[in-house]
Structures are given as C-alpha cells and as structure tokens.
C-alpha cells in the first residue's frame, strides 16, 4: 500500500499512525523494508501523548505504549493547555525515563503553527528557545518604561 501511495501520488510527507495497539517499532521496520526500493526517507518518529493519561497508559498498555514512547524521536504532549505545571512535569518525567533522547513538546499545540510542529518533529528547531525569544520580544517595550 505504501509503495502504491508513493508511486501514484509522490507525496512530500506521509504520516503513519500505529492505531490501536500497534507498535511504532513494527511500523518503522515495515517502512524501512519499502524504503529500500523507493525514494523514501524516514526522518521522524512521532508519538502524541495525552498529558492526562501518560501514567495510566503506561500501566494499562505497557509494552505497546512503551514501544511507541521509546522509539519516538519526538513526543508531542496533547491537552497541555488545561493541565497544571505539575501534571506536565510528571508526564515529561515518565516519558523521559522511557526515552531520554526524544524531544518532548509541552507547549499547548493550539498556539503552535503547523510549520513549527513539523520543524520540531524533523529536529530542525529548538521550539523552547524560539518561543522564549518571541515572548521576550513581545514584552520588551513594556520593560523600557
């Protein structure tokens, strides 16, 4: 199916979501097999994690959830806009324990542009530094007075 999509549509990007209890590592292996014969580059492995359910999912879905977290190059936390700092920090700690090298996006995704999310997924931007720079620039005139 992936080969047909690539050859028919020539997409710039293909997103594959391992639904249900699929493993990210299995999806990655399958795509790597197809990539041997097609112009396909695996450049990011992203997991979206609900900040309110990380602990519960680790407990209830164990191997499958841990596989998605441990094989991700980027983990985007959802529902952070209404979560406390403590809840976000606890989720980050649990995720970082399973995958200390992944970029973990904690910014409420409703304030991020699609381009910012793609850049972070691709490992091309330091979103924290960028948002801090924007915040400083927005408050700079207020500090002068």
Could you describe each region identified by the protein language model?
Residues 1-58:
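Nucleotide-state-sensitive switch-loop elements of NTP-binding domains
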Residues 20-23, 51-55, 80-84, 109-113:
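Conserved nucleotide-binding/hydrolysis micro-motifs of P-loop NTPases
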Residues 35, 76-80:
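Short amphipathic alpha-helical interaction patches enriched in hydrophobic/aromatic residues
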Residues 45, 75-76:
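Short, well-ordered beta-strand core segments
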Residues 60-63:
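Charged helix-capping and loop-helix junction motifs
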Residues 67, 71-74, 82-145:
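C-terminal accessory "lid"/substrate-recognition subdomains
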